Amino acid sequence: MASKIEILKANLEAALGARVVSLTEAIGELTLVVKASDYLEVAKTLRDDPKLRFEQLIDLCGVDYQTYGDGAYDGPRFAAVSQLLSVTNNWRLRLRVFAPDDDLPIVASLVDIWTSANWYEREAFDLYGLVFEGHPDLRRILTDYGFIGHPFRKDFPVSGYVEMRYDPEEKRVVYQPVTIEPREITPRVIREDRYGGLKH
């Protein structure tokens, strides 16, 4: 008798055919990778096909693969990853799509298929700079409207570019260049044989 994952894998291969770039299993979960050009149609099929019935998008996030595999990775930099749930069939699926252009990462919006994607896509736009084409209200959701850059990108500085503080003379919040100085972290060296009761 086939397991639930084997049944789901067979159903996905039958419904999607050549639109499957890869379909892998790890840690009891399936990950489906599709091309950006097929993304919207695949999502509709995942929701509407009676043998799949993924009624809910429960999460969507951006991923920056710039430093993945310590530089050994040589593929597209940005991806949108969705977690889908079929209540009807009691199974889950991870759906990944890579943005074809690293300079301006654009993928289709899933808001018209799963309305729950709305704020998730805004978050991925805000933090990674992923543009979701067709999104009804794609604007920042976590950072300030005047924020420069996308803070979850691997090339964004840890300390950021600007900081804000309250200026009592101007009686308002002002932005200024970051004043945090880089710290040099020196490891603690224990020089005594019985320091703190430790035996060496």
Swiss-Prot record:
Gene that encodes the chain: nuoC
Subunit and partners: NDH-1 is composed of 14 different subunits. Subunits NuoB, C, D, E, F, and G constitute the peripheral sector of the complex.
InterPro entries given in the database record: NADH_DH_suC (IPR010218), NADH_quin_OxRdtase_su_C/D-like (IPR037232), NADH_UbQ_OxRdtase_30kDa_su (IPR001268), NADH_UbQ_OxRdtase_CS (IPR020396)
Top-level EC class as recorded in UniProt: translocase
Source organism, top-level taxon: Bacteria
GO cellular component terms, semicolon-separated: plasma membrane
GO molecular function terms listed in the Swiss-Prot or TrEMBL record: NADH dehydrogenase (ubiquinone) activity; NADH:ubiquinone reductase (non-electrogenic) activity; quinone binding
Xref: Pfam families: Complex1_30kDa
Catalytic activity, as annotated: a quinone + NADH + 5 H(+)(in) = a quinol + NAD(+) + 4 H(+)(out)
Entry EC number(s): 7.1.1.-
Record's keyword annotation contains DNA damage: no
Family to which the UniProt record says this protein belongs: Belongs to the complex I 30 kDa subunit family.
Subcellular location: Cell inner membrane
Protein's recorded name: NADH-quinone oxidoreductase subunit C
Membrane topology label: Peripheral membrane protein
Keyword Plastid among UniProt keywords: no
HAMAP family listed in its UniProt record: NDH1_NuoC
